[in-house]
């Protein structure tokens, strides 16, 4: 597709771009006869005068028209029909661009129907994904990949994930109680690290130590578990197959925590109780455990399609986020390679998910944050309370500076703009397009220095708002003109297409714009 060729971008330092993709062009292209998926109704995209898009240096004009079909098909112009998402490469990743909670799970759930394998590569139960099935039932997943609702998909929890088994089994029990069969469809890496209750306790003690400088952790034990991994006294899933040495390793973890934190008391009885619990877990987990590095790479060699579901988001990345107010893993593109054992040159499409505005849970700098009634109005409209913690999310305008930074790091090929419907009815909408220092100097990129970030003045563009309810819209052309201009201005500022546009929580509330 002309659009796909224009949008393809190499992952910086990871995926080598082809010479063709790197060439600059000013040619104007037309999107012709490409139906796209939107749940119950489908779209046929054709050339027209509506919806100008700038992709790198390529101008594209498209008009979407709704059609009805029994399945998602596309007219290729050669008499053959193909699925609207068939242009996606063998390996596709869906990553967050902001501070999490962008709605990645919904796109993964939709795309999972077209992929053989859905894999998670990093993070733990701090990644809350909310998805809905065809009956409208809500599922809040934290460890299990969102593709689990598609019965033909195999879900993989990779080596880069930290796993709290009590929570993991609770998710499985909840899924199966609602008729979702996980047997033989859910695989756990033998290299993944186990997250124990003591990690969660230590997480809370660490936050208490920081007092007024708290990071705002979810207290799910993610950081302490990755710390155990880094100092090499962590316990891996594969260790459950060697229970004769498991207690000794567990004892070391308990003693280490007691030595570090005054509030943590070591006792042999506590170690024994944990050991007794994990003997039971070992038996139940056994049929889930595999060498996922071998499984994923074998699946790739066999031509199977692999979808990678990112947890958290780029601005929470331990290397690129607002450190130290970040997570303890790499939710950016590099985490895919280290968290699954997949070579960089095998990565294909990388879709960045961004809310039409910005939210953040917990502490840390947030330049476009809205306070008072404005922030509360946006929070209520978007139901912005954390999936994992239930904490109210901080809300603000879309931060283009941060979004461009995420695009640079990850080499996204397209953007999934979510929750556009939340902006309906607001008196005005704004985009934070630049940062300026106190002296008025415009910053070239997102700063690492938090003292600078906390003092920047955001330069905004104010755009015309729209009053119409767009939750039933399934065609880009049917969006209010003001909403289209908002989308197109974002595309101009980041140089990428907003190919997927979310207009509501349900599976069908998606416009695919080609």
Swiss-Prot record:
GO molecular function, one term: magnesium ion binding
Reaction(s) the record says it catalyses: IMP + L-aspartate + GTP = N(6)-(1,2-dicarboxyethyl)-AMP + GDP + phosphate + 2 H(+)
Amino-acid positions noted as binding substrate in the UniProt annotation, renumbered to this chain: 387-393
Coiled coil start-end: none
Keyword line: Chloroplast, GTP-binding, Ligase, Magnesium, Metal-binding, Nucleotide-binding, Plastid, Purine biosynthesis, Transit peptide
Pathway the protein acts in: Purine metabolism; AMP biosynthesis via de novo pathway; AMP from IMP: step 1/2
Record bears the keyword tRNA-binding: no
One cellular component term from this protein's GO annotations in UniProt: cytoplasm
Subunit text: Homodimer.
Family: Belongs to the adenylosuccinate synthetase family.
Protein's name according to its UniProt entry: Adenylosuccinate synthetase 1, chloroplastic
UniProt source species: Physcomitrium patens
């Amino acid at each position: 597709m002309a659009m796909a060729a224009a949008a393809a971008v190499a992952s910086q330092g990871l995926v080598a771009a082809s010479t063709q993709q790197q060439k600059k062009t000013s040619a104007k292209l037309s999107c012709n006869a490409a139906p796209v998926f939107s749940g119950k109704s489908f779209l046929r995209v054709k050339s027209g005068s509506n919806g100008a898009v700038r992709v790198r240096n390529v101008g594209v004009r498209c008009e979407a028209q709704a059609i009805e079909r029994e399945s998602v098909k596309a007219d290729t112009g050669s008499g053959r029909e193909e699925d609207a998402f068939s242009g996606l490469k063998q390996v596709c990743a869906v990553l967050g661009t902001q501070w999490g909670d962008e709605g990645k799970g919904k796109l993964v759930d939709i795309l999972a129907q077209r992929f053989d394998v859905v894999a998670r590569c990093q993070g733990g139960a701090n990644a809350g994904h909310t998805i809905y099935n065809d009956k409208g039932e809500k599922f809040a997943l934290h460890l299990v990949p969102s593709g689990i609702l598609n019965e033909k998909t195999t879900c993989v929890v990779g080596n880069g994930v930290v796993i709290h088994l009590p929570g993991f089994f609770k998710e499985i029990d909840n899924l199966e109680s609602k008729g979702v069969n996980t047997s033989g469809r859910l695989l756990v890496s033998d290299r993944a690290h186990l997250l124990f209750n003591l990690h969660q306790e230590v997480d809370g003690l660490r936050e208490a130590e920081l007092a007024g400088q708290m990071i705002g952790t979810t207290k799910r034990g993610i950081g302490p578990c990755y710390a155990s991994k880094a100092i090499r006294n962590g316990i891996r899933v594969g260790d459950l197959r060697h229970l004769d040495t498991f207690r000794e390793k567990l004892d070391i973890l308990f003693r280490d925590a007691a030595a570090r934190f005054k509030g943590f008391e070591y006792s042999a009885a506590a170690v024994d109780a944990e050991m007794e619990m994990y003997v039971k877990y070992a038996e139940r987990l056994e049929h889930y455990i595999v060498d996922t590095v071998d499984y994923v790479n074998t699946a790739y060699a066999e031509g199977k399609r692999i979808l990678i579901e990112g947890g958290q988001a780029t601005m929470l990345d331990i290397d690129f986020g607002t450190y130290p107010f970040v997570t303890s893993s790499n939710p950016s593109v590099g985490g895919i390679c280290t968290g699954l054992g997949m070579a960089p040159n095998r990565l294909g499409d990388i879709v960045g998910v961004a809310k039409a505005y910005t939210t953040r849970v917990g502490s840390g700098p947030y330049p476009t944050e809205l306070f008072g009634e404005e922030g509360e109005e946006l929070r209520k409209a978007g139901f912005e309370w954390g999936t994992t913690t239930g904490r109210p999310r901080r809300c603000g305008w879309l931060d283009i500076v941060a979004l461009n930074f995420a695009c640079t790091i990850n080499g996204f090929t397209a953007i999934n703009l979510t929750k556009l419907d939340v902006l309906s009815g607001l008196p005005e909408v704004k985009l934070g397009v630049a940062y300026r220092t106190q002296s008025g100097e415009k910053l070239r990129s997102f700063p690492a220095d938090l003292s600078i970030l906390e003092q920047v003045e955001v330069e905004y563009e104010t755009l015309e708002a729209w009053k119409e309810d767009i939750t039933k819209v399934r065609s880009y052309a049917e969006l209010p003109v003001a909403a289209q201009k908002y989308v197109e201005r974002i595309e101009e500022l980041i140089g990428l297409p907003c190919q997927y546009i979310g207009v509501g929580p349900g599976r069908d509330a998606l416009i695919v714009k080609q």
